[in-house]
């Protein structure tokens, strides 16, 4: 599977009361990867929601990624995204197998991405590129970093942080393979608008 296009990331607070409706609306518009991001300690609910999302993703031929929880990912047969504080990538690869998608947060540091690539990452994520409500304190990344990463890395590059339809095009033009979007996708007034935004993000890769 080619990892290129929209990478939708859920936010339990933003999607309160409309979680599945908006997620399915995004999938309708086209999502390459869907990340389930929930930082709560309610393990039973997280398992239930992850299994529901997995079934939705299978229907739309999308791959599900679990944020920061390799054990949950292994339990349901999903991929995982690991932050820099979540430990080395190698144990997750051993747990999930060779075919699983494993992503790694690399902030704005190319050496972190090069290390993740050596450890078997499926993709690396840089950001934040713009002001972000999800990660307000994250170090800023630049288009120059993206150019350097594109020249030295031979795996998909994901970009994250305040990405909207108004600012995403330069990121794609500088080599981003995956646009990771939270509020720029799900902060819409209606499910129909979520679908429209998803289609518009994907169109940036074909222009």
Curated annotation (Swiss-Prot):
The keyword Ion transport does not apply. 2-[(2R,5Z)-2-carboxy-4-methylthiazol-5(2H)-ylidene]ethyl phosphate binds at residues 132-134, 162. Its EC number is 2.5.1.3. GO terms for cellular component: cytoplasm. InterPro entries: Aldolase_TIM (IPR013785), ThiamineP_synth_sf (IPR036206), ThiamineP_synth_TenI (IPR022998), TMP_synthase (IPR034291). GO terms for biological process: thiamine biosynthetic process; thiamine diphosphate biosynthetic process. Pathway: Cofactor biosynthesis; thiamine diphosphate biosynthesis; thiamine phosphate from 4-amino-2-methyl-5-diphosphomethylpyrimidine and 4-methyl-5-(2-phosphoethyl)-thiazole: step 1/1. Its cofactor is Mg(2+). It catalyses: 2-[(2R,5Z)-2-carboxy-4-methylthiazol-5(2H)-ylidene]ethyl phosphate + 4-amino-2-methyl-5-(diphosphooxymethyl)pyrimidine + 2 H(+) = thiamine phosphate + CO2 + diphosphate; 2-(2-carboxy-4-methylthiazol-5-yl)ethyl phosphate + 4-amino-2-methyl-5-(diphosphooxymethyl)pyrimidine + 2 H(+) = thiamine phosphate + CO2 + diphosphate; 4-methyl-5-(2-phosphooxyethyl)-thiazole + 4-amino-2-methyl-5-(diphosphooxymethyl)pyrimidine + H(+) = thiamine phosphate + diphosphate. One of its GO terms (molecular function) is magnesium ion binding. Binds 1 Mg(2+) ion per subunit. It is an enzyme of class 2 (transferase). CDD domains: TMP_TenI. Mg(2+) binds at residues 68, 86. Keywords: Magnesium, Metal-binding, Thiamine biosynthesis, Transferase. 4-amino-2-methyl-5-(diphosphooxymethyl)pyrimidine binds at residues 35-39, 67, 105, 135. Condenses 4-methyl-5-(beta-hydroxyethyl)thiazole monophosphate (THZ-P) and 2-methyl-4-amino-5-hydroxymethyl pyrimidine pyrophosphate (HMP-PP) to form thiamine monophosphate (TMP). Belongs to the thiamine-phosphate synthase family. This is Thiamine-phosphate synthase.
């Amino acid at each position: 599977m080619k990892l290129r296009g929209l990478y939708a990331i859920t936010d339990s607070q933003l999607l309160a009361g409309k979680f599945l409706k908006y997620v399915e609306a995004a999938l309708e518009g086209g999502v390459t990867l869907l990340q389930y991001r929930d930082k709560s300690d309610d393990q039973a609910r997280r398992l239930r929601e992850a299994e529901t999302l997995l079934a939705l993703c299978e229907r739309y031929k999308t791959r599900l990624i679990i944020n920061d929880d390799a054990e949950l990912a292994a339990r349901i047969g999903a991929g995982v995204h690991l932050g820099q504080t979540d430990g080395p990538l190698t144990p997750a690869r051993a747990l999930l197998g060779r075919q699983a998608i494993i992503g790694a947060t690399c902030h704005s540091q190319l050496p972190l991405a090069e290390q993740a690539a050596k450890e078997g990452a499926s993709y690396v994520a840089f950001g934040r590129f713009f002001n972000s409500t999800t990660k307000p304190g994250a170090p800023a990344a630049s288009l120059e970093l993206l150019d350097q990463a594109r020249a030295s890395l031979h795996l998909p590059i994901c970009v994250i942080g305040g990405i909207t339809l108004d600012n995403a095009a330069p990121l794609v033009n500088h080599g981003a393979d995956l646009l990771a979007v939270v509020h720029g996708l799900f902060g819409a007034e209606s499910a129909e608008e979520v679908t429209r935004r998803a289609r518009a993000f994907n169109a940036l890769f074909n222009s």
